[in-house]
Design a protein with these regions (language model features):
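Conserved class I S-adenosyl-L-methionine
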Residues: 1-37, 40-49, 129-154
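Class I SAM-dependent methyltransferase SAM/SAH-binding core
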Residues: 50-86
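A short acidic, Gly/Pro-enriched loop at the edge of an enzyme's catalytic core
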Residues: 89-98
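A short glycine-rich, Lys/Arg-flanked "PGG" loop and its adjoining helix->strand segment in the class I
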Residues: 114-129
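Short alpha-helix
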Residues: 163-183
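Conserved catalytic loop of SAM-dependent methyltransferase domains
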Residues: 182-224, 230, 242
Length: 292
């Protein structure tokens, strides 16, 4: 079953996530109006969930359609569709912005992602912006995958409401897939290098510190836990390892330097350490392109 309750259940809302609400949605709130301001006000929201992108669009939004296995966007037009089957019944009118947030691109197989990109390029108009987020290959969540080639070897089970199959990506790999589809790559931006998955345990690398849980505790007014000051175990040699080790050291210094500060203040200081990288080092990797 693809469209029913059984298929949608793994992707259903997993409960309140204070880190996402406080920090990650803030970044999306900056992104969506900028995209609409640059390309136009018609937005196709791929994997729309509860319609967050539509709510964050503000006055720049002129037309909206959300696609999801089980849409929950009250008051916004949506269609129930599985993006693994392609773009779906979105009508003939092109959109100005095609947006897929929170790792949606990694929930498709490499072949399914390529098919979706081709269909987006055909549906959009010249100049339509395409902003799709994948899971970053060089995330601290899975250093054992850093040297793994794209394809079946890199496809792993990932826990949401239940296990789903995901495929992390490097930016250069996605740039090439955009080009093959007729979409000019414009840039890449990492999201959430420090906080990792919503679950506190790691299935892929036991050295992953539960930073997300530590930030959530700070936002609740609790003191900083060990996860926020611990150093990282050894990682595969290379720039991703140096970046992640340096970020952990900066986080430790920030916590020790802010001793006595309130939990939310310290959480903001830690989040401010997020570097403006685009190399696939974060939990999320956003690729921006333009239909040629």
């Amino acid at each position: 079953m693809r469209l029913g309750q059984t298929a949608a259940r793994p992707y259903a809302w997993q409960g309140h996530d204070v880190v996402r609400r406080t920090f990650e949605e803030r970044e999306l709130a900056r992104l969506v109006p900028r995209l609409l301001g640059a390309a136009g006000g018609a937005l196709l929201d791929l994997g729309c969930g509860d319609g967050l992108a539509g709510r964050l669009a503000g006055t720049r939004l002129t037309r909206y359609l959300g696609i999801d296995l089980q849409p929950a966007a009250n008051g916004l037009p949506t269609v129930a569709h599985d993006l693994r089957d392609g773009l779906g019944p979105v009508g003939s009118r092109p959109f100005d912005v095609y947006l897929g947030s929170f790792g949606i691109a990694s929930h498709l197989s490499p072949e399914g992602l390529q098919r979706l990109l081709v269909q987006i390029a055909r549906h959009g108009h010249r100049g339509s912006l395409v902003a799709l987020e994948a899971l970053g290959l060089y995330s601290l969540e899975w250093p054992r995958l850093w040297g793994t080639p794209a394809g079946a070897e890199r496809t792993i089970p990932y826990r949401l409401g239940a296990d789903v199959r995901v495929h992390p990506w490097a930016p250069g790999e996605l740039f090439e897939r955009f080009r093959l589809a007729g979409i000019e790559p414009l840039g890449a931006r990492d999201r959430t290098l420090q906080a990792g998955p919503k679950l506190t345990e790691s299935r892929y690398w036991p050295g992953l510190p539960p930073v997300r849980a530590g930030l959530a505790a700070l936002l609740a007014g609790c003191p900083a836990g060990e996860a926020l000051t611990s150093t990282l175990p050894p990682l595969p040699a290379g720039f991703p390892a140096r970046l992640h080790h340096a970020l952990a050291e900066r986080r430790r210094d920030a916590v020790l330097g802010a001793a006595g500060a309130g939990g939310p203040v310290m959480a903001e200081a830690i989040w401010a350490l997020e570097p403006p990288t685009g190399g696939g080092y974060g939990h999320g990797l956003l690729i921006l392109g333009r239909v040629s």
